[in-house]
A protein has these predicted regions:
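Proteins enriched for Cys/Gly/acidic motifs involved in redox and nucleic-acid/cofactor modification
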Residues: 1-115, 129, 159, 170, ...
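Conserved SAM/AdoMet-binding glycine-rich loop
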Residues: 99-210
Length: 210
């Protein structure tokens, strides 16, 4: 009787779907078998209205959350851990946007450069990275340009830089916050990189994508 009471009680509580991946992690900690709640994340992303307008440039959410915990930022506490939308879902929405006239897509995420499709399914094997996602989306014939934001310096991979070099649809534009030129400030901000790390990264990008 008591179990039924609590089941009925909790079933009436409002659900913050953006936090359910955290619930999943806690359930797995308590019980390795856990309960599969991934369908909630499907509903979260699928709740976006299908765009019918004819704008040339459109925004497309591919990732949410952040695991960096910079001291000045509330995103990890309000958006939760990083998780990525399935490639199939992104491609379907992108195709719809392009068919409705979009020629440019901007991929959005609190830390979009950390996109990895395996995060969504909590898999151990490698999934599709942001570079791979850009390559897949570039197969849409009518799509002319791809952009993305916002990035973190620690997640700009060689694979992504190479994709910029080889993919003509991926624009030579990088939104990469520097935050500070002082190592002591960067350390206090918990950015986990130095001024030199940032400069070396920019030099590497410029060398590969002049």
């Amino acid at each position: 009787l008591l179990n039924n009471f609590f089941s009925d009680f909790f079933s009436q509580l409002p659900v913050d779907q953006s936090r359910l991946h955290i619930v999943k992690k806690r359930l797995l900690y308590l019980d390795p078998v856990g309960s599969d709640i991934y369908y909630f994340l499907d509903e979260k992303f699928d709740s976006f209205p299908v765009s019918q307008d004819k704008n040339v440039s459109k925004l497309l959410t591919v990732q949410e959350g952040c695991d960096k915990f910079c001291t000045f930022c509330v995103v990890p506490y309000t958006r939760g851990s990083e998780y990525s939308r399935p490639v199939e879902s992104i491609y379907a929405e992108a195709r719809n946007l392009v068919n409705n006239g979009a020629q440019e897509l901007t991929l959005l995420g609190q830390n979009v450069s950390a996109y990895n499709s395996s995060v969504y399914k909590n898999l151990t094997e490698n999934g599709v990275s942001l570079a791979g996602l850009c390559k897949i989306l570039s197969s849409l014939e009518k799509l002319k340009r791809i952009r993305y934001l916002t990035s973190h310096p620690r997640d700009i991979s060689d694979e992504l830089i190479n994709e910029h070099s080889s993919n003509e649809k991926l624009m030579p534009f990088l939104h990469l916050p520097i935050q500070s030129g002082s190592d002591s400030i960067l350390k206090k901000m918990n950015r986990k990189h130095t001024k030199e790390d940032y400069i070396e990264l920019i030099s590497k990008i410029k060398n590969r994508v002049p």
